[in-house]
Amino acid sequence: MVAVVSIATDRLTKVFPDGTVAVDGVSIEVGSGEFVTLLGPTGCGKSTILRLVAGLEEPTSGRVLIDGEPVRAGPGPNRQLSMVFQDYALYPHLTVAENIRFPLSLGPDSPAAASARVAEIADQLGITGLLDRRPGQLSGGQRQRVAMARAMAGESRAFLLDEPLSNVDAGLRAELRTEVAALARRLEMTTLYVTHDQVEAMTMADRVAVLRRGRLQQIGPPGEVYRDPRTLFVAAFLGTPRANLLQAAIYAPDGGVLLDLGSQLIELPPGDPRVRPLRERHTERVTCVLRADALSPVPDPSGPAPVLRGVVRSVENLGHEALVRVTTGTVPTPSGQASLEQPTSGQHLSELLADDLPAGHPVRDRLARMIPHPRPEQPPATARTEYGFYPVYDPELRGEPADAGAVVIRVPMPVLPRVGEPITLAVDLDQLLLFDTSGDRIRLG
């Protein structure tokens, strides 16, 4: 096998004839021997990037570079990249041994040398006993190993893998992802791996590149991308269960900051280091991201941590822990959590609220007692310049307002809350992530 190489894309763009922008100016570098995953939902452009790198598609603009040198269009020998497809692409009329040997038949190796190479690779992947079978006689996991073996057989300079485990059952998938990652590292093979499965991406890769609508959102080590997401999409896409996304408005009285969630508040006291960057955003709408482990049940709400109050809506027992869904009455993001879309941009709180809050609105009443705030004279009918935030639900959410602002938390076994009972949740402010109306991270220090 020849020396492994680095792979890079330079402002790579692909526009299909119907006008679909599949890849939009993506620049990624994969170092020699590095394992990088391209992660994102269906249609984000990750498989198209892989095909562009392999030479199976021609870019509309931009370049693919191997060891820093641009490569010409087409999948010719100047690339020497082995690709493993989602459907394995094995020849059904050939035996396993013949499938593995196929790329060697195109090179200078003698039949004896090729057979020795096949035997060596089969032993490495534990498929020696399958060499005389045909693909139709193999399980999904066995076919995947054969596809990997064929990729290893030629003089490959890098592996390109397009969702290779998506057709494998869940029980075998965990085993195979460990095998694939270990094999790539043992061979010190440069690997570009496409997946929509965040578990695969986070457990296998040296670095993860998160894509959305053809654009690179963020790239970095898995732990860094998870802990320090740059955009709302990355924060929402990574993590199981999905992060809780709540709409809030910033109110900055003297000294401190209040995050107004519609029916509840998260208060940051004057001495909190997060206050200063938020005071400049008085009345702005933001999205609060709280992962499941940022919220924990507490029996006594009088502690130093801010709390959210709610009612248990459902309990999903997973054996070692439970996922508990709690209705808080707070405001979900305008476009809904399921779509992972960013909030609409460019508006301040005063432009987003109805003209009048309902009588007895708890946040308004509480704030009025805490911080007197005069009503402006003859405010415009479409603007609100006083504090307060009143829930306005998306059409998709109007049918179930009782579940608005539901959050999911992790609860250890064996003591679990019951459906319908009230619950108080402490908020870990160190895990609170805030994003502006364009979906960009607000740095809190």
What are these regions (language model features)?
Residues A8, E29, L65, T424-A426:
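ABC ATPase nucleotide-binding domain
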Residues L39-P41:
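The feature captures the beta-strand-to-loop junction immediately N-terminal to the Walker
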Residues A54:
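Helix-to-loop junction immediately C-terminal to a conserved catalytic motif
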Residues T60-R63, R213, L432:
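Conserved coupling/switch loops of ABC nucleotide-binding domains, chiefly the family-specific signature
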Residues G62-P70:
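Conserved ABC transporter NBD signature motif
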Residues G74-L238:
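ABC ATPase nucleotide-binding domains
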Residues D254-G445:
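Non-catalytic connector elements of ABC transporters
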